[in-house]
A protein has these predicted regions:
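TRNA-recognition modules of translation machinery and tRNA-sensing kinases, especially anticodon-binding
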Residues: 1-129
């Protein structure tokens, strides 16, 4: 049995978590000053949220963690970036109808890409956008 994190991932240990909390708090404070609202979307979405018509980008073709639900035609993908999920939420919840436009939103959280790990590049990483 293998008791190590998968290649390209890492644990954030108690000795380091305060730094992460502080960074996230600074991001939230900065965004609050400029009237941005935080949005949180699911860690996985329907695969078509990330696929665009005729998209041949590496991220779509090679770097997404996609899985098929058992006994179903449903395909889900771990989010490789945050923007597509935010756009999906904006449309799904008709946010254009009850908010002043343009809306100013931000997200911060883990993203997952199946890319070759290298120095400074992990398969699970945090992104602010």
């Amino acid at each position: 049995m293998n008791y190590q994190v998968p290649r390209g991932t890492q644990d954030i240990l108690p000795k380091d978590i305060r730094k992460w909390h502080r960074l996230e708090e600074l991001i939230r404070q900065f965004c609050h000053v400029y009237n941005y609202d935080e949005i949180r979307t699911p860690i996985f979405e329907h695969t078509n949220v990330f696929k665009r018509g005729n998209d041949s980008s590496d991220m779509v073709n090679k770097e997404m963690y996609t899985f098929q639900l058992e006994n179903s035609s449903t395909s889900l993908t771990l989010r490789p970036e945050g923007t597509a999920g935010v756009a999906r939420a904006f449309v799904e919840h008709k946010m254009y109808g009850y908010a002043d436009l343009p809306m100013k939103m931000y997200y911060v959280g883990p993203q997952c890409r199946h890319e070759r790990p290298q120095k400074g590049r992990m398969r699970i990483f945090n992104q602010f956008g």
